[in-house]
UniProtKB/Swiss-Prot annotation:
Organism lineage: Bacteria, Pseudomonadati, Pseudomonadota, Gammaproteobacteria, Legionellales
Alphabetized HAMAP family for the sequence: Fe_S_insert_ErpA
PROSITE patterns attached to this UniProt entry: HESB
Cofactor note: Binds 1 iron-sulfur cluster per subunit.
Protein task: Required for insertion of 4Fe-4S clusters for at least IspG.
Keyword Repeat found: no
Names of required cofactors: iron-sulfur cluster
Any Pfam family: Fe-S_biosyn
InterPro entries xref list: FeS_biogenesis, FeS_cluster_insertion, FeS_cluster_insertion_CS, FeS_cluster_insertion_RrpA, HesB-like_dom_sf
Name this protein carries in UniProt: Iron-sulfur cluster insertion protein ErpA
Record GO biological process: iron-sulfur cluster assembly
Family per record: Belongs to the HesB/IscA family.
GO MF annotation terms: 2 iron, 2 sulfur cluster binding; 4 iron, 4 sulfur cluster binding; iron ion binding
Keywords: Iron, Iron-sulfur, Metal-binding
């Protein structure tokens, strides 16, 4: 398992403080401090790949663990990304936004060559670009 602490800017994936705050809020609602946010990429969607968000207590051997401190300065949360998904998320930003269309987790992924209107499906160019 690779462990990366984004508070020390050692990760090539940006897990925002606003995303960490929302994850902490959701974990508190579930009343299970062992939960971590897992981001994954699977085949499917209208553009070829799709993002998945889930909570997971299990940290697998091939997971990259990104730790982000919350805005309160006291608590932190963990983001888990499996090795297959990690290669497609290089230099991406995982954020939580509030806007006119509601609230949602978003991934700004520079590796995505095209995205669909829903924002949860994307395609990549040549795998050599990764």
């Amino acid at each position: 398992m690779a462990s990366v602490d984004v508070s020390q800017n050692t990760s090539d994936i940006n897990f925002s403080v606003s995303a960490a705050d929302k994850v902490a809020e959701l974990i508190k609602e579930e009343d299970n401090s062992d939960l971590n946010l897992r981001v994954s990429i699977t085949g499917g969607g209208c553009s070829g790949f799709q993002y998945g968000f889930s909570f997971d207590e299990q940290i697998n051997d091939d997971d990259t663990v990104i730790i982000q401190q919350c805005s309160d300065g006291k608590s932190s949360v963990k983001l888990l990304i499996d090795s297959m998904s990690y290669q497609y998320l290089h230099d991406a930003e995982i954020d939580y936004i509030k806007g006119i269309q509601g609230e949602q987790f978003v991934i700004r992924n520079p590796n995505a060559k095209t995205t669909c209107g829903c924002g949860s499906s994307f395609s990549i160019g040549d795998e050599d670009d990764l």
